[in-house]
């Protein structure tokens, strides 16, 4: 087989492919063996019709069509591999010659990944955020623990305050008519949580247990239930019980109750270490993202529209899958958010374009620096995946190969190594109290 690639436009390549006559002959025989099993010819059992008679019955063109349906994709993908082009869409194929005893000639026109003009990606100046943890940070974390483990205690007297949990009965009306689904009994509502329509919870502040009050609210214009959007409603609310958090004092007993430590000091030290580790992780992530951002900003590339369109479709598909796992369809989500698919595409477009450019630039840097993923690194990644899913590594490998996902493992590793390369070759300043120092 022979293949020649010619760039006819900036991101368009013309492949001229020649497949030898012997391969066509084999493809024709394969086509005959496949078709003869599905076509009944008078006087012969299905699958037993001699080829010359079968060809006369169905027409030789049927065999040519079946043979080319098999031969063209095989030859095309081999040509792509041999020429090293990177297609971004399906090719437009034009058959030039197909005749038994002669080579098959066809052309394939296809858009390919654009060329990237790299800018500066070494010696990037980056600032690592401060990872200092103050005593105040630790105390805030202790307060969060106090609130998390606080007990709700029923008030014998007093009124509702922000942060309290009120047990309420409520019934809503619009123009005197009950709201469908707008009533509840013994509903537990944390005041200030934003669980109800804006203005509802605020109007419960100051109510005592046993008190009933009429409150007025207006549903937002983009409210998920369209029949209520923008309408004014009146709710009758009865507070049946008020519960308030009982905060445990910060002492050794508290430490024992909420952790594996015996003293408050040990708990403080542990929280400090965890906050420090979290801060270091955030700083490392920020440095990586800043390195990628600068390298991408410094590069130039004209992105074909089809790449952005495909990326957009992937992003929407990922969102739809995530919503589906939560029992919600994309259509319902759009309805609840008061937007359309066109609105969603428009809002996602800049991110899609940025994602494509980032991928192209990182690929270009990897090529320029000879960054690759070794077989051993791929094997190690598969072992990690297998351990996570409690599967045999070989079973995971075969599954990835079957689904054509193995190359994405290698691509992910190359991307990680490329980002690491950017950071290792950057000039990193340390941010200490808002001042960047080397």
UniProtKB/Swiss-Prot annotation:
Annotated compartments: Cytoplasm
Domain PPIase FKBP-type intervals: 163-248
A GO biological-process term: 'de novo' cotranslational protein folding
InterPro entries assigned to the protein according to its UniProt record, in alphabetical order: PPIase_dom_sf, PPIase_FKBP_dom, Trig_fac, Trigger_fac_C, Trigger_fac_C_sf, Trigger_fac_ribosome-bd_bac, Trigger_fac_ribosome-bd_sf, Trigger_fact/SurA_dom_sf
Origin superkingdom: Bacteria
Disulphide linkage map: none
Catalysed reaction, written as an equation: [protein]-peptidylproline (omega=180) = [protein]-peptidylproline (omega=0)
Gene Ontology annotations for the cellular component aspect, listed alphabetically: cytoplasm
Signal sequence residues: none
Keywords recorded for this protein, A-Z: Cell cycle, Cell division, Chaperone, Cytoplasm, Isomerase, Rotamase
Record GO terms (molecular function): peptidyl-prolyl cis-trans isomerase activity; protein folding chaperone; ribosome binding
SUPFAM superfamilies: FKBP-like, Triger factor/SurA peptide-binding domain-like, Trigger factor ribosome-binding domain
Domain notes: Consists of 3 domains; the N-terminus binds the ribosome, the middle domain has PPIase activity, while the C-terminus has intrinsic chaperone activity on its own.
Protein name: Trigger factor
